[in-house]
Curated annotation (Swiss-Prot):
Protein name: UPF0262 protein blr1257
Pfam families: UPF0262
Disulfide-linked positions: none
InterPro entries: UCP032146 (IPR008321)
Organism taxonomic ancestry: Bacteria, Pseudomonadati, Pseudomonadota, Alphaproteobacteria, Hyphomicrobiales
Organism per entry: Bradyrhizobium diazoefficiens (strain JCM 10833 / BCRC 13528 / IAM 13628 / NBRC 14792 / USDA 110)
Family to which the UniProt record says this protein belongs: Belongs to the UPF0262 family.
Amino acid sequence: MTKPPEQDDSNNRIVAVTLDEESIGRSGPDIEHERAIAIYDLIEQNLFAPEGADGKGPFTLHIGITGNRLMFDIRREDGAPVVVHLLSLGPFRGIVKDYFMICDSYYQAIRTATPDKIEAIDMGRRGIHDEGSRTLQERLKGKVRVDFETSRRLFTLITVLHWKG
């Protein structure tokens, strides 16, 4: 028995992701590396089901900042528009700030600190990343269904975007 399109997740996935070049903040090689890995991992395995799309993916996603909002421009693989979601950046500001501070500490630590100190900082970094991922999942509720791993990878991409505030 086949599942109805809205329950069959085989097409509920992202096959391409782009970031708005004007939204990308300045970053060093460590952040660029994380971004490349997040995009690769996201495309390799994800669950991304826009509400109302009835499993008619796969999808492409363009992420950017417009005004004070995070923009998710979702399209079908052939470029046909599905929906554009604008999410307030407010819930992410403190999390992203904390994430960058701990990432700075982590990148400094991996060059000079003991393995125990690196592990402790990395645990804190993962905890803040998980918090951002859960916040993103909550903000997308009723708009786009994503699993936790997809949300984690999307949050990584959000952190490389630049916004004022």
